[in-house]
Amino acid sequence: MKLENKIALITGAGSGIGKAIALEMGSAGAHIAVNDLTAETAETTAHQIEDLGREALVIPADVADSEQVENMVQQTLNCFGRIDILVNNAGVYIPQDGGVTAITDEAWQRILDVNLNGPFYSSRAVVKDMIARKQGGKIINISSVQAEVAHFDASAYQPSKAAVVMLTRTLAVELAPYKINVNAIGPGAIASEGMGASLGPEVIEAYRKRIPWGARGYTRDIGTVAAFLASEDAGYITGQIIYVDGGYLSDSTPTELKSQDHPVPPDDPDSK
């Protein structure tokens, strides 16, 4: 297995994309430190990791809190002795109907705290161990296609994800001498509970019509890319943003000119 006995710390792994990444890496042989806001959500993923014959550690923590992040990393080191892979997946989207004038200071700060500060805090804490061990490492950040395109009512979320892109590139340059690969994945429209809850069916359908592939992706589509980036097969890849979006960012065809004959796939069973 490509990740046999590797140790991965994955934030926001209790559901959705984070859970899919954890299961994919577990299937590839890794042992997983499963972080989420609450132990209850993380435990569901941990049990599935253990069913794969791998070890799992549940660590509830808010990645927006630097002290909690330091404790999370230390707990992982205490349990497994090292961290080979960090996946900064935890994120938050707060709907802001009304645009920039409607978003509150609290919502703005929360989005930046989780989506940007969280990956920074986690990377800073993990990198100390990676550098000290002199064995390299892998950091994978989860950004979004919304780092590249703008639309209404996302004046906090989109800047936060764009900042993750530059954080990825900066860390890749800084950490290359230590053979620490830093890359990001930018999901497009993914069939997950989180997306359904935050956007609603009408908005999701509108996005689907914009996708050249004709369908939303599944959470496991992100999981497989993350597992590849965490493997030695991706050893010379660093500072890159891999968009997994069914061609969304490449297409400028007006929606009115698109064929609507694509079949609609069922909801992703792995996102539950």
Regions found by a protein language model. Give the residues of each.
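C-terminal substrate-recognition "lid" of short-chain dehydrogenase/reductases
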Residues: 2, 80, 181, 216-244, ...
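Canonical Rossmann dinucleotide-binding motif of NAD(H)/NADP(H)-dependent dehydrogenases/reductases
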Residues: 3-33
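Short C-terminal tail/terminal secondary-structure segment
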Residues: 97, 238-272
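Substrate-binding pocket helix/loop in short-chain dehydrogenase/reductase
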Residues: 97-100, 104-112, 207
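Active-site helix of classical SDR
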Residues: 123, 160, 168
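Alpha-helical segment proximal to the catalytic Tyr-Lys
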Residues: 128, 173-177, 235
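Residue(s) in the substrate-gating loop at a strand-loop-helix junction
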Residues: 144
